[in-house]
Amino acid sequence: MTTTLNADPAELAKFSELAHRWWDLDSEFRPLHQINPLRLDWIDKLSPISGLRALDVGCGGGILADSMARKGAHVVGIDLSTKALKVAQLHALEAQTPNVAYREVSAEALAAEAPGAFDVVTCMEMLEHVPDPASVVQACATLVKPDEWMFFSTINRSAKAFLYAIVDAEYLLKMLPQGTHEYAKMIRPSELAAYCRRAGLDLQQTRGLEYNPLTQRYSLSADTGVNYMFAAQRPA
């Protein structure tokens, strides 16, 4: 596990600059709001979260953390963007979201502090933004209790992902700001699977997320060519 802070200052600055727009449904974060019901339902079916202690790694403005808390989980969201965390905290206060707290701490630091403290760990749309994604996966594996679940989502490093996630989403459809994603930082499913194996995790399920520009809707799919999610368990 890395000993230096596993963060890219440019990435932190980029998302901090947009922090005030996290809960604007017509902003650059609209895609996250659109996919959130799909990923929340998928998580809840594999690991019913009501009453569980959940950790959301790279929580940003709290979109997933807030929705898990509203499903009955006791949630801690962590991030390294001070501005994003302030937005998440303010939203929780205004929306009166129960049982959610936010901390400015890295996954690695929290893993050293509280190993095996959580019933479920999520790390969504974050791995492609850090210098050492394998270190984050290892930290997640340390943080979750034995026999419990972790959920990851990221973007494939493929020609299709370059076309859809960068050219289309950032330049043609302008769904995201230019420079949101860097092709070299995207992660192939085989690479994420290798990170999971090295962390001692058992991969249980893979799902793709597909976007239909005509209906402007996302759906779960077997196609992992662009956005995809992994469900893994820490062995008992």
Regions picked out by a protein language model, each given a short descriptive name:
Residues 149-173:
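Conserved class I S-adenosyl-L-methionine
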Residues 134-149:
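A short glycine-rich, Lys/Arg-flanked "PGG" loop and its adjoining helix->strand segment in the class I
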Residues 95-109:
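Conserved SAM-binding strand-loop segment of SAM-dependent methyltransferases
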Residues 111-120:
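A short acidic, Gly/Pro-enriched loop at the edge of an enzyme's catalytic core
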